[in-house]
From Swiss-Prot:
GO terms for biological process: ribosome disassembly. PANTHER family: RIBOSOME-RELEASING FACTOR 2, MITOCHONDRIAL (PTHR43261:SF1), TRANSLATION ELONGATION FACTOR G-RELATED (PTHR43261). It is found in: Cytoplasm. Residues 8-282 form the tr-type G domain. One of its GO terms (molecular function) is translation elongation factor activity. Belongs to the TRAFAC class translation factor GTPase superfamily. Classic translation factor GTPase family. EF-G/EF-2 subfamily. This is Elongation factor G. One of its GO terms (cellular component) is cytoplasm. Catalyzes the GTP-dependent ribosomal translocation step during translation elongation. During this step, the ribosome changes from the pre-translocational (PRE) to the post-translocational (POST) state as the newly formed A-site-bound peptidyl-tRNA and P-site-bound deacylated tRNA move to the P and E sites, respectively. Catalyzes the coordinated movement of the two tRNA molecules, the mRNA and conformational changes in the ribosome. GTP binds at residues 17-24, 81-85, 135-138. The keyword Lyase does not apply. Keywords: Cytoplasm, Elongation factor, GTP-binding, Nucleotide-binding, Protein biosynthesis. InterPro entries: EFG_II, EFG_III, EFG_III/V, EFG_IV, EFG_V, EFG_V-like, EFTu-like_2, G_TR_CS. The lineage of its organism: Bacteria, Bacillati, Cyanobacteriota, Cyanophyceae, Synechococcales.
Length: 691
């Protein structure tokens, strides 16, 4: 079957931003103007096409990244609308991993917010080219050039306006295209009757200044363009367009556009810019991966190359499990068998689907550059590689952050107990930041996630989708343990109870590991003092002990263990004996390494009227917060701080009462830091009292 669109005319893009910047409304307008939907859905009415979960429609926020295909100007555009709430950061993360370009949406009033910085960093991590759409230009306080300054200062991006608004707030009449040097005046509320005209006389000087700045920025990206600019004093429209595109692809510049998605202004011009400036799959570097022999290899974006794809999302569906895939190379056909190279498992492709939010179109094949979904995969989870069996490769996977908060879940009845297991399995398959474990002491089921809202949504889904009635405990902070010193440890397990005994003996060295390494094991046994077959069990005993720590029962992180010596018995030694000896040696060593407790620190930004600044800073300090910066603009104060998560429960209610409902805040995970001794002692004694 021939391609519907050549690869050069495919765009895989994401729409990402801070919560409430207007991403979903922006996506809705794109679908309306490109003909996918014939009636505009509004987020505040709970009718947005991309918000298809019940919770999304109720809360007016996007939780899961909905993938939609549409067309514009003879191009296929695959769009992922990502959530802006920090608790759903994995949805943004996995979207960035499979996209070729991003539209970063900013509110013309709020500008750069903390979550904007997080999304920007995620796009940086995967080197995703991007453009900026400054939305909500119709709102009171909208200021396009202020947002331009914030993007340059706070995000350190070379933001270059390629448009200017004509008017602002209630007086937003249209948009200036700096590339074409034309004005677009909107004549109706639907944004379909647009008059193209000359630049208004009162804006000629301003437009001339910004057009010159645009030319200078583009001339700096390429020597040929610089010569043309110096020779002629300006660049042609074609040179401007090719220069912007080249600058975007090389991450040299970020074009800035503006409009109001809600008021239907600027969306068609945004679609034109997506087609003109964001990359096709063939414009980005080919995906890298590892061959079975450990050598690096690449897969070009080409139908003729061996098939490879990345599973970037798994979702429960009334018809079975839906696995979203980004096709990187080759062709995937319905009914074929492929290899899951991450798990070394064969998979059958039952059905292939292209999605339009909760609408779907069955297809016979997916090709390089496509975003689609597969029905019927048994073993594939988020981050797995699918490839041709005879041309195996494992692609770079996803970065998955650790959960920071947990709650105990107790089913109300026996039938709820049976349904709970199924619900938790299904939800954890969908969301890798959602973890399920059993508390060894209480035998309770514990679920962990990225924040209170994250767990609230998941518990809500258990009730709605899986009909599980459960009691939910109070939120608990996910503390960690680590060590600050080095030492050695020894474990000898010897039992003689008639007949065959048990014997295992290991000696280890323990030291702090590099941040982010978790548990690192090195085998330095020489001369066979511990036979090869007992090394893995000894390591396993240490890893298991790591899971429950040594001072307060929390997982131990960033520890390096080196196995240096030991002994065995020809008859009595066994894998179990060495597993126990490994655990004993680990506990012995860790206790001598100055173990400490770590807690998740949150980056908290609070925005309040100036009058409340003093009480806000005082309150943050009382919560063990460290104020890292503050600013005052138009009577509004912004305070940036780092606060322990343990001190932030119930903060929304407290902030409302302190500011008479006029304060807002955002919070995201920053890092793990050592808990002060007096606080740590209370946590440790509480945990030891419970054990």
């Amino acid at each position: 079957m021939a391609r519907a669109f050549p690869l050069e005319r495919v765009r895989n893009i994401g729409i990402a931003a801070h919560i409430d910047a207007g991403k979903t409304t922006c996506t809705e307008r794109i679908l309306f103007y490109s003909g996918v939907v014939h009636k505009m859905g509004e987020v505040h009415d709970g009718a947005a096409v991309t918000d298809w979960m019940a919770q999304e429609r109720e809360r007016g926020i996007t939780i899961t990244a909905a993938a939609i295909s549409t067309t514009w100007d003879d191009h296929r555009i695959n769009i992922i609308d990502t959530p802006g709430h920090v608790d759903f950061t994995i949805e943004v993360e996995r979207s960035m991993r499979v996209l070729d370009g991003v539209i970063a949406v900013f509110c013309a009033v709020g500008g750069v917010q903390p979550q904007s910085e997080t999304v920007w960093r995620q796009a940086d991590r995967y080197s995703v080219p991007r453009m900026v759409f400054v939305n909500k230009m119709d709102r009171t306080g909208a200021d396009f050039l202020k947002v331009h300054g914030q993007i340059k200062d706070r995000l350190k991006a070379n933001a270059v306006p390629i448009q200017l608004p004509i008017g602002a707030e209630n007086d937003l009449k249209g948009i200036i295209d700096l590339v074409e040097n034309k004005a677009y005046i909107y004549k109706d509320d639907l944004g379909k009757d647009i008059e193209q005209t000359e630049v208004p006389s009162d804006m000629v000087d301003l437009v001339s200044d910004w057009r010159l700045k645009l030319m200078e920025s583009i001339a700096e990206t390429e020597e040929e363009l610089l010569e043309a600019f110096l020779e002629n004093g300006e660049l042609t429209i074609e040179q401007l367009k090719s220069g912007i595109r080249e600058g975007v692809l090389k991450h040299g510049l970020v074009p800035m556009l503006c409009g109001s998605a809600f008021k239907n202004k600027g969306v068609q011009l945004l679609l034109d810019a997506v087609v003109n400036y964001l990359p096709a799959p063939v414009d980005v570097p080919p995906i890298q991966g590892l061959l079975p022999n450990g050598k690096e290899a690449v897969r070009p974006s080409d139908d003729g190359a061996p098939f490879s794809a990345l599973a970037f999302k798994v979702m429960a569906d009334p018809y079975g499990k839906l696995t979203f895939v980004r096709m990187y190379s080759g062709v995937l056909e319905k009914g074929s068998y492929v290899l899951n190279s991450t798990k070394d498992a064969k998979e059958r492709i039952s059905r292939l689907i292209i999605l339009k939010a909760d609408d779907r179109e069955e297809v016979d094949e997916l090709r390089a550059g496509d975003l689609g979904a597969v029905l019927g995969l048994k073993n594939t989870t988020t981050g797995d590689t699918l490839c041709a069996s005879e041309e195996a490769i494992v692609l770079e996977t996803l970065y998955i952050p650790e959960p920071v908060i947990s709650v105990a879940v107790e089913p109300k009845t026996k039938s709820d107990m049976e349904k709970l297991g199924k619900a938790l399995t299904s939800l954890s398959e969908e969301d890798p930041t959602f973890r399920v474990s059993t508390d060894q002491e209480t035998n309770q089921t514990v679920i962990a996630g990225m924040g209170e809202l994250h767990l609230e949504i998941l518990v809500d889904r258990m009730l709605r989708e899986f009909k599980v009635e459960a009691n939910i405990g109070a939120p608990q902070v996910s503390y960690r343990e680590t060590i600050r010193a080095s030492s050695s440890g020894e474990g000898k397990f010897a039992r003689q109870t008639g007949g065959k005994g048990q014997y295992g003996h290991v000696v280890i060295e323990v030291e702090p590991g590099e941040p982010g390494t978790g548990f690192e094991f090195v085998n330095k046994i020489v001369g066979g003092s511990v036979p090869k077959e007992y090394i893995k069990p000894a390591e396993s005993g240490m890893r298991e002990t790591c899971e429950s720590g040594v001072i307060a029962g929390y997982p131990l992180i960033d520890v390096k263990v080196t196995l240096v010596d030991g002994s065995y018995h020809d008859v009595d030694s066994s894998e179990m004996a060495f597993k126990i000896a490994g655990s004993m040696a680990f506990k012995d060593g860790i206790k001598k390494c100055n173990p400490v407790l770590l807690e998740p620190m949150m980056k908290v930004e609070v925005e309040v009227p100036e009058d409340f600044l003093g009480s806000i800073i005082g309150d943050l300090s009382s919560r063990r917060g460290q104020v890292e910066g503050q600013s005052i603009e138009d009577g509004q104060s912004k305070v940036q701080s780092k606060v322990p998560l343990a001190e932030m429960f119930g903060y929304a209610t407290q902030l409302r009462s302190m500011t008479q409902g006029r304060g807002i805040f955002s919070m995201e995970f920053s890092t793990y830091e050592e808990v002060p001794r007096n606080v740590a002692e209370a946590i440790i004694s509480k945990n030891q009292g419970n054990s």
